[in-house]
Amino acid sequence: MKRLCCFALSLLPLSAFAYPIEVEPQLNGSEVSYSTQDIGRDMGAILLTNLGSQAAECTAVFRNGPETPKVRKGVIQPGQNSNFTAQFGRDIIKLRIKLTCKIAK
């Protein structure tokens, strides 16, 4: 019985699918808030909300280890949301997102 309990406890880490997401924001005067999401074991997302009174141009660069970075761009109107997603060929261990926003002209 003791061995069965130890075996069951050893499987618990395998059930965790969450991974850390690190965001490096560079907002440059735009009023954009963000929240991250882990969608699956090989897919991540960032939800952007424009809280300002002017449109914002945003670029998100998703990095997962040695894979090629995925770049997502968009213009977010005032009071609107935008969801940027990226899917990778490998499981994500730690996702790094470089977020750059500026006021649209």
Task: Describe the residue ranges of each PLM region.
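Asparagine-centered strand-capping/turn motif at beta-strand->loop junctions
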Residues: 48-54
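Sec-dependent N-terminal signal peptides
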Residues: 4-14
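Structural beta-strand segments of beta-rich domains
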Residues: 42-46
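Intrinsically disordered, low-complexity Pro/Gly/Ser/Thr-rich segments with frequent PxxP/GP/PP motifs
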Residues: 65-92
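Secreted/extracellular small peptides and ectodomain modules produced from precursors
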Residues: 3-4, 56, 99
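Short, hydrophobic/aromatic beta-strand segments
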Residues: 55-61
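Transition segment at domain starts
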Residues: 16-38
